[in-house]
Amino acid sequence: MEKWVIAAKRADFNQIGQQFHIDPVIARLIRNRDVIGEDKIREYLSGTVQELPSPWLMKDMEKAVDILEKKISQKAKIRIIGDYDIDGVTSTYILMKGLARIGADVDTYIPDRVADGYGIHAHLIERAETDRIDTIVTCDNGIAAAAEIQMAKDKGMTVIITDHHEVPYREEKGERRMVLPPADAVLNPKQYDCPYPNKNLCGAVVAFKYIAALYERFGVPAEELEDYYELAAIATVGDVMDLQGENRILVKEGLYRLKNTKNQGLQELIRANSLEDAKITAYHIGFVLGPCINASGRLDTAARSLALLNAKTKEEAARLAGDLTALNQSRKALTEKGKEEAIRIIETTELKNDRVLVVYLPDCHESLAGIIAGRVREKYHRPAFVLTGGETSAKGSGRSIESYSMYEELVKCADLMIQFGGHPMAAGLSIEEKNIEEFRRRLNVNCTLTDEELRPKIVIDVPMPVSYITKELVEQISLLEPFGKGNTKPVFAQKNLRVLDHSIIGKNKNVVKLKLLDPQGISVEGIYFGEAEDFVNFIREKDSVSVTYYPEINRFRGRESLQIIIQNYC
C-alpha cells in the first residue's frame, strides 16, 4: 500500500508570490522543488540560455579545443565513436555537424548493440588504425575504457573523451580515487576536480559544450549553436536527466525550437507520430519521439536514427521516420511480452522475496532489458536487473529506486562481472551465466534497504480543495514546465469527494470519466487513466473517495472547462 505524505517545506509563500507575481500555491510548488533564494527562483521562472555556465569551466576544455584546432589545421582524420541510444546518437550528430562546420575531416561510427556492444572496444581501435584515423573523439562513452584507450595511444592515435557516466574509482585507505583512462583530454563534469557546476549533464550536452567552445575559438557566430538546443533537449529528457537548473533551461529552449525545427528528420518524425499540431512537451520526447529514435539502436542499427537526423530531403526523412515509428511499435509488443514473462518468474519463484530483483530472460532481446527492468521496478518498487542471453555471456540492465545507489552496489560485485558501468539510478553489465545466481545472492546479502524504503511513497505538494482551482492557477502551473525527473508534475490532494456520476470510456475501455462533488458543494469533472474496472469497483463500494490529482483545462470543440486528472485514490 502506498504511503501518502505531504511535502512540509517552509517559506513565506505569500511574500514570494507578491515578489514574483505568482499565486502562493505556485510559490509552494517551487519551494517543494528545492528552488530557494531570489536568484534561483528568478532563474527557475525566467532563466535563459544566455545565462548558462561557460563551456570553458569544464576540466580539460582548453586542452581538448587546442588539440582539435591543431588537428583540423593538419587535416588529420578524425573519427567520432558514439553510442546506440538516444543520447549517443544525438551526441554523435552534434559533434559530427559541429566539427564539419569548422572544417574537420570527420566521420562517425556508432557501435552495433549486439555485434559491438557498448562503447569503444579493441576491434574498433583496430578498424580505426586500418582506416588511418589520427584522432578518436568518443561521445557518451569512454570514461571506463582505460585498456582500449591505452591501445589507441600505443598505436599512435590521439584520443579525446566526451562522456557523462560515473568515473571509475578504487578505494584506497577509505578514500575514493578516480581511475581515468589515459586519453589526451577528458571532458566529463563528473570528474572530482572538474569545476563545471552542473554535474548532471547528459552526453549530448557535454558534446554541445565542446562544440560551443570550438565555435568560439574558430570565430563561428554564436547564433549557429541554436540548432543544437532541440537535440540537447531530446537527449536530456531521453536519457532521463534531472530537469533542474541548466538542464531545465536547455530543455525549455529546445522544446520551444523543436516545434519549428529546421531538421527534416525531426519534422517528419513529428509528423509520423501525428504531433504536427500538438504542443510538444517533455512527455512527447520521453514517451513518443524519443522511443522512436531509440528503437533503431534496440532492434536494428542506430545508424538509421543518425541517418534520420542527417536526412537531406523530405522523402528520405519521411521514409526513415516511418521505419523508426514502425520499429517502435514492434519494440512495444516485445517489451510487453518480456515484462509479462519477468513478472511470471518473480511470482512463481523465490525471487518474490528478494529486495533486489535479478531476472534472467535468456530469450529476450538484449536491447529491451533496461525497459523491462524499469517496468519491473515500477511494479514492485524494488531495484531490478533484467539479464538476457548472449553468445558467450549474459548482458543486462538495472533500474533503481532513490534509496539504492546501483552503481555503488555493482562495484561491490565487480569480480563477478565481465564489464559494468552506469549511474546511481541505472546500470548496464555483462556477466557469465554461471555467475548470475551468485550475483543475485550477493546483491541481496549486501542490500540494506528497509521495509519503509521499499514502500512506494506519494509526495503531495499541496492538499488543495478543488474549489480553489481556477483557469489562472492552471496557466501559472504551466510556468513550472517542462516536467520530468527532478522537476515532477505537481501533485495536489483532496479528501472526501462524492462521486455523482461515472462512465468508462475510451477505445480500450481504460478511462473513467467522473462528476465529483467536494465537501463545500463545488462540482468538478474528473478523469482517471489506469485500471478502470478496479477504480469503478472501489468507488461503488465507498460513499466518498480521496484522491491525488493534477488540474487541467479541458479544451473541446472550442469550449474550455476545468477538470482534474486523478493520479491515485484511497
Task: Give residue ranges: language-model regions.
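Short, well-ordered strand-loop elements centered on a beta-strand within folded domains, enriched
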Residues: R177-M178, A183-V186, T392-S400, S523-G526, ...
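Catalytic domains of riboflavin
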Residues: M1-K3, L479
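Residues at the C-termini of beta-strands that transition into short coil/loop
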Residues: D112, N188-K190, T388, C570
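A short acidic, amphipathic alpha-helical/loop segment
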Residues: A147-M151, L357, I372, Q476
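Mid-to-C-terminal polyanion-binding domains and interfaces
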Residues: K70, Q74, E316-Y360, K412-C570
